[in-house]
Amino acid sequence: MKVEALDKFWADKSRYDLAEKRFYEGPQKVTDRSHYSPLVSEIAKAREHIQNSLEKIDGVTLDDGLNSELAKRLAQLEGEHKELKTQVSLLNELLTATVKRLETQLKLTNGVSKEPEVEAKKPEANDDDDDVDLFGSDSEEEDGEAARIREERLAAYAAKKAKKVQIIAKSNIILDVKPWDDETDLKVMETEIRKITQDGLLWGASKFVPVAFGIQKLSISCVVEDDKVSIDWLTEEIEKLEDFVQSVDIAAFNKI
Amino acid sequence: MGKEKIHINIVVIGHVDSGKSTTTGHLIYKCGGIDKRTIEKFEKEAQEMGKGSFKYAWVLDKLKAERERGITIDIALWKFETAKYYVTIIDAPGHRDFIKNMITGTSQADCAVLIVAAGTGEFEAGISKNGQTREHALLAFTLGVKQLIVGVNKMDSSEPPYSEARYEEIKKEVSSYIKKIGYNPAAVAFVPISGWHGDNMLEPSTNMPWFKGWKVERKEGNADGKTLIDALDAILPPARPTDKALRLPLQDVYKIGGIGTVPVGRVETGVLKPGTVVVFAPANITTEVKSVEMHHEALQEAVPGDNVGFNVKNVSVKELRRGYVAGDSKANPPKGAADFTAQVIVLNHPGQIANGYTPVLDCHTAHIACKFAEIKEKVDRRSGKTTEENPKFIKSGDAAIVNLVPSKPLCVEAFQEFPPLGRFAVRDMRQTVAVGVIKAVNFKDASGGKVTKAAEKATKGKK
């Protein structure tokens, strides 16, 4: 009942507004070096720690023969890529220089002609062909020119994107948690479930839904950060409450 | 909402920056789901804040913020209506666990909508080789989502805006892209849209006079139209499998005082009625269904899609478990599988898979380890042609025909016969490392097993 009321009518909007305000004010105050800072630095430390350990784990998984070989090859390719890039830019410079020279020469000899430009463009495209291979494009039907255009656009897009703030990918999930019988106390079950916490996990609204023959299930929504919370982990954690929970099913799974 | 409209499910796939959520939001906002009061409240707020001209953006942002807080669990948030259908829309998240949900989850999509962005570089980034879009599209096709619509989005931000040349360029690229996955581009509607401004969403846009409309050719009948909503309306309705044999995978089994044992699950195919003598595979337990309920209401007939509980006599709660499948004992009853052959696509396995590999398979509600007994051949995903016989191993990106042997009794079916029981996710290290569709099942002989007195009586009574 309570939940349904929430759906239709936002009685305690002012509370949310306040919370929202606090949330947005938070980070700014921190920069003022106010009383928040010890906690914040503590969090930062913890984050760093997690980051470190994650990196270490990555290192470990990378350690098996195949991957380290891949990494080596990647590094090599990257090196080559850099080299080629510098070469290409050199070639470009040379090219513009030649074009200019040609133009001036042509102007001197027989007025203005567009031919040299066309000729000059061809070698440029060929140069960039090497670049394309580096990007591992294996579609043979693609000609160098198309690939070049694509890479240019990608680069422009990447530059544009870099300026934009990265949005954290999140999903909204509705879980159906089923009890053992009609005597399981769903309220206690819910309280226990809400005790499961994790960075990037936010529990949302819930309601009891009739199944059949007097049994009810708990439908509970949560918001997770895609990179931080595994849904398998989450369902396993809930299923660990085996005094209450028979099974967990995912009723809905959507991008936010 | 009248009752005559058919219900369909669609899944929206595309790069995170394709604007697919805006497009999805637009449809839900304009045609559905969100109750009028909520919208009115947000629209009023927009006016008060002096954002009247950005009313639409404001409302979408507010709805998103509301979702982020998870303060509502109204599934209606993901529903809208077209002239012909009630649509449930799934906005495919990038979360890795979503793939498993696509396979074992509650709603199989009837159509996929691929959104690509027309902006410079955005399109190119969106369909790059390693993108999730490719994976989702490939999965959708593999899992039997044979209908596709392509929305070329953000036409307002192409250079120049609403550029026909850019649209044609993208259409050509995407056609070859989806052809590689297996779709027939001629049967796919391409619509240039702006989910943000609303061009060609519900009404034909005046910004793109060059667009003469989309056309699809398919053997079930051609269709054409101008807008995205037209394209959704042209989706071929799914054949609801009521005429097939009953298959009901169990989710849970309850013991209820005064009533007895109550298995609960979703009817995938066929119908379940009180009085049906059902068999539970693979345990091969036969008994009679006394009554059927959904949301506490007695049903005379449960049809595909219904999540029901039913009361069975003389069977204890310990004899049944999640993953068992109920079927009609007299009409093509389900049986346990001795082994089965499947086409498996390796998505993201860090190493190599060889004969003997025994990961856990998630198929309908079952969760059972199965052995890759024999990797028979490597195949071309699209054509199904053999590329290598008896390969030593398979790795990420490969498709193969594999013979699998379950480690415990398991009931599965060929995908052709019973799609929801014929597709599975291969789980290892908490990840979906591969997906598969079952080509053929070698059933165990259904001898032995228990027949309850209630079942005997019911059977005799009918003779």
Swiss-Prot record, chain A:
The keyword Phosphoprotein applies. PROSITE patterns: EF1BD_1, EF1BD_2. Gene3D superfamilies: 3.30.70.60. It comes from the Eukaryota. InterPro entries: eEF-1beta-like_sf, EF-1_beta_acid_region_euk, EF1B_bsu/dsu, EF1B_bsu/dsu_GNE, Transl_elong_EF1B/ribsomal_bS6, Transl_elong_EF1B_B/D_CS. Residues 110-146 are annotated as: Disordered. The modification Phosphoserine is found at S37, S53, S89, S137, S139. One of its GO terms (molecular function) is guanyl-nucleotide exchange factor activity. One of its GO terms (cellular component) is eukaryotic translation elongation factor 1 complex. GO terms for biological process: translational elongation. Residues 126-144 have a biased composition (Acidic residues). Keywords: Elongation factor, Phosphoprotein, Protein biosynthesis. Residues 114-125 have a biased composition (Basic and acidic residues). EF-1-beta and EF-1-delta stimulate the exchange of GDP bound to EF-1-alpha to GTP. Belongs to the EF-1-beta/EF-1-delta family. EF-1 is composed of 4 subunits: alpha, beta, delta, and gamma. This is Probable elongation factor 1-delta. It comes from Drosophila melanogaster (Fruit fly).
UniProtKB/Swiss-Prot annotation, chain B:
The gene is eEF1alpha1. Residues 5-242 form the tr-type G domain. This is Elongation factor 1-alpha 1. One of its GO terms (cellular component) is cytoplasm. Residues 70-74 are annotated as: G2. Residues 194-196 are annotated as: G5. GO terms for biological process: translation; translational elongation. Belongs to the TRAFAC class translation factor GTPase superfamily. Classic translation factor GTPase family. EF-Tu/EF-1A subfamily.
